[in-house]
């Protein structure tokens, strides 16, 4: 199973994609705190108040996961000066690592500027021999556009399987990106 490199230098944007480190604690806490309103309808793990202890615990777990072959591997997208967290991409291996489910989020401050799209394409390009999946809510057109911009195609719709206070009943859209032939 391919393991994500320590660092990616994005060629299309002025940003860097790195493995988790404890040095990300405060920039990550700020990004999550500032993005709560936008994330809450779609990410069930977000909380309205984010403290440093929660973020450190999460980062320690993310660091430890790199020693566990089938655990999720998170990559954080940082501004070029590494002062701000732009977003995060998680890679969850399936089976024996022949495919991954990808999750992602963007800081509200950087959303819609192409950073996460470039990072997702870069990560996918580093995993050319595996099938990649991601899911999104039918109520989240930004995430759908991001998936399609990164080369994913809608392969299945699970009707009415999501329900929340923000959007009511929604579908889950399953996207797949095949390895090149």
Predicted regions and their residues:
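Acyl-donor (CoA/ACP) binding surface of acyl/acetyltransferases
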Residues: 1-27, 31-38, 74-181
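Conserved GNAT-fold acetyl-CoA-binding loop/helix
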Residues: 40-61, 73
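Short alpha-helix boundary/capping motifs
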Residues: 56-60, 67, 151, 174-176
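Short, P/G- and charge-enriched loop/turn segments at secondary-structure junctions
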Residues: 62-65, 162-163
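Short loop/turn motifs at secondary-structure junctions and domain boundaries
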Residues: 65-71
């Amino acid at each position: 199973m391919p393991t994500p490199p320590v660092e990616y230098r994005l060629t299309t944007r002025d940003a860097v994609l790195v493995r988790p480190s404890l040095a990300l604690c405060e920039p990550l806490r700020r990004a999550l705190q500032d993005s709560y309103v936008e994330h809450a309808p779609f990410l069930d793990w977000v909380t309205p108040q984010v403290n440093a202890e929660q973020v450190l615990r999460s980062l320690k777990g993310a660091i430890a996961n790199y020693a566990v072959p089938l655990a999720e591997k998170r990559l954080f997208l940082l501004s070029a000066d590494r002062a701000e967290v732009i977003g995060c991409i998680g890679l969850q291996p399936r089976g024996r690592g022949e495919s991954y489910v990808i999750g992602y989020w963007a800081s509200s401050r950087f959303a819609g500027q192409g950073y996460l799209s470039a990072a997702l394409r870069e990560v996918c390009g580093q995993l050319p021999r595996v099938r990649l999946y991601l899911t999104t809510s039918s109520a989240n057109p930004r995430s759908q556009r991001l998936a399609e911009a990164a080369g994913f195609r809608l392969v299945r719709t699970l009707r009415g399987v999501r329900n929340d206070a923000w959007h009511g009943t929604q579908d889950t859209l399953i996207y797949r990106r095949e390895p090149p032939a």
